[in-house]
Amino acid sequence: MPNHDLTAEQVRDLRALAGAIIPPSATYGVPGADDEKIFSDILRSLGRDRDDICRALAHLARLAGGAFADLGPERSAQVAVNFREVGGTPLAALVRVVLLCYYRDDRVMRSLGQEPRPPFPKGHVVEQGDWSLLDPVRARPRMYRSVD
């Protein structure tokens, strides 16, 4: 495992929480965010969010009264709901990392009907929408100062 500066208990809690945020789906044939490959990517991707994620995990442990990963399904669901309500910015950083890593996984992209590849140089086709929806934005006065 890479140097992620998390304790073994924090890693277990993060993995359990990632699986609660995005559980596996047999219907769509996709893994949960606690899948080995996806979770390894999460640990490698903590980067600038490491401090917020450590704060979030410490808060989660306080709410759980110990290790979140050791809770039963019913209690962990209660703690997760409470954590979602009070987690604030640290939780938002944690969720962002989980989502970014989850949607980088080839299996997930294929389940969404997307070819698992970078958007360039081939690009992706974006369906045309109703451009008139932007009319209220275009009608607004400028919100910036002109440079000339």
What are these regions (language model features)?
Residues R12-A20, D35-S45, R50-D148:
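Mature-region segments of soluble proteins
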